[in-house]
Amino acid sequence: MSLSGFPISALGLPLPPSLIPSLSEPPVPTFSSLNPATGEPVWTGPAATPAEVAAAVARARAAFRPWSRTPHAEREKILRAFALALEIRRVALADAISREVGKPTWEALTEVTTMAGKIELSITAHARRCADFTGGPAITRFRPHGVVAVFGPFNFPGHLPNGHIVPALLAGNTVVFKPSEHAPLVAELTAAAWRDAGLPPGVLEVVQGARDTGAALVDSPDLDGLFFTGSARTGLWLAEKFARTPEKILALELGGNNPLVVWHPRDLRAAALLTIQSAYLTAGQRCTCARRLIVPAGPEGDAFVTYYITLARSLRVGAPTENPEPFMGPVISASAADQVLAAQTALLARGATPLLLSRSLRADTGLLSPGLLDVTAVTDRADEEIFGPLLQLIRVPDFDAALAEANATRYGLAAGLIADDPALYARFRDEVRAGLINWNQQLTGASGAAPFGGVGQSGNHRPAAFFAADYCSYPVASIEVPTLTLPATLPPGLNPF
């Protein structure tokens, strides 16, 4: 396994003379990940150059044939060894997630647990969805694509790329992984776990870097596919790039402007807690986070909103290392925090009513307080995903209007209803257009034993999680006759000698 961009100096060893750059050589571009709660560097190292990206793809190509011919049981064995290696590194990996991404320790530990749990789920999914099967005289088998690229996001720097990498390797592909530039240390530790699990060299290549490194990987002519989790803007750019190469598989898992409808719940406390977790987990940086809160106009809706605001004000926000532990850490960077606050300012300028303003809690960091704006009177609301702890409230006169508002988006990732009436949920489930629809459950709760993906501009109909096996291989249908014989009947005009 190769780690392009690995900082040798981080090992505390002197550089060998052959690796000391001469004064005449151009400087190697470097980048750093920063702790979003403090602004301090966590990891510093070189970004992979286009030549290094090409070399990584070439190594993955060379490793593909032997890896794809490795018995499936042996690949499963390596995957299970990887799960054990993650458990051994659980604390170190969670610490890296907290420092690079800002997740509280409880949340970072949960992510590592989810990474390890992905192994058995992927093995089960592959067995169910990619097993050879027969139908009459035909048999269908599944083959890996070849070399696939995986682009990882920052919000789940371990879990989400893992959700592509594990099923891809299990199917027999080799992978070139470009992690988020915000979480290179998490990627290094994950790659080390794969190495300790016995993954052969070249089967997983890691190329560190930001936009230029990613662009070099996208432009590689020797890729057979790319699996991406991230913003809709980047996803649309990738779709355009891949439009002229239909022979390459492209799986896009994008964001959403997700609606959560709260409709006359009897238990205001439970409804408010579910809404808080839907809107503000991971500082509002989960792609399934609620962005729009839809409630009935009138006293009952007002009562819920009042209770919700009281609860939101009590949330503990802070650095992951603080004691007692916070519910919510920072957004990924000070720049990201500025973007959330700029979006809030723009909505206020259009007529939104501030019910709970999101504020910067510490200069030059990503620490923000949760926000809630009433945008009912804003007629020109942008259909955009605000990636942070800012929720927009919309009051509607009836449930028909709630359904219409829920569908008023070009996205379609997640949607939820909090209500006691099962008949309302039956309507919601059947009429709202989204790939993930929850009832009396936080939007940020998804099952690895089910598909994960959206419609509209939230993806390209390549759901991940339990259905990731589908885009990690392709079917080959064969009609096979072991003994060559003359057909019993021949078409008219065809007479054998």
Feature names for model-found ranges:
Residues T234-A377, W439, A488, N495-P496:
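ALDH superfamily catalytic-core signature
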Residues F64, S68, A83-R90, A94, ...:
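Structural signal for hydrophobic packing residues in well-ordered secondary-structure cores
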Residues G39, R75, I97, G172, ...:
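Residue-level signal for inorganic ion chemistry
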Residues V42-A48, A63-R69, V150, L260-W263, ...:
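Short, well-ordered beta-strand elements within core beta-sheets of diverse protein domains
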Residues P36, P50-V53, H72, R90, ...:
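Residues at or immediately preceding the N-termini of alpha-helices
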Residues M1-P137:
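N-terminal Rossmann-like NAD(P)+-binding subdomain of aldehyde/semialdehyde dehydrogenases
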Residues A131-A270, G298, V396:
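Rossmann-like NAD(P) dinucleotide-binding subdomain of oxidoreductase/dehydrogenase enzymes
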Residues N35-T44, L223, V261, T310-R313, ...:
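Conserved C-terminal structural/oligomerization subdomain of aldehyde/semialdehyde dehydrogenase
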